[in-house]
Amino acid sequence: MQLDTITKFLNTFFQVERYNEEEQGGIYLPSTRSIKRLGLALEPWDGLYNWVKSQHIDALFLHRPWKLDVEQLPPDIGVISYHLPFDESLTLGFNTRLADVLSLSNLEVFGEKQNRPIGMIGQAPNQSFTNICNCIKEVFNEYEQIRAASESEVKKVAVVGAMTDLLVREAASHGVN
């Protein structure tokens, strides 16, 4: 498999046409090497270059490649990078895969940045506040902050990548409990 085959798939998966050219991602460091082993990392770290060599990595997917020292990589290692498309598709925000895991339905866009959704509101199957907290902990392994709902049953949930006080109030005005 070649680097461009992987990026064609990821370009479609991440719907990169939604982003301006500088934010689309794709091939960060080109290569013609055939890819059998793809290394995945959020960003470069001190041991990355030895890891690439010891694991016989043919190409890297880096979420944040900016501190990558390409001179330390073995010759002809390709690098793929998707930052904003990754954040908006695979983390918090308008993430339909996450909505499926949380059993949310009737999704609505919640909040926008540069005409792109930064969050979602969805109907949750009626469940207790404790149950939804347990579900969130199971999916994410922890949560930064959570406050008890005024009602014992949770029916509507907001998921946002960068929740602010203003967005909390706006979510409440949309019936999020």
Regions found by a protein language model. Give the residues of each.
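Hydrophobic structural segments
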Residues: 1-177
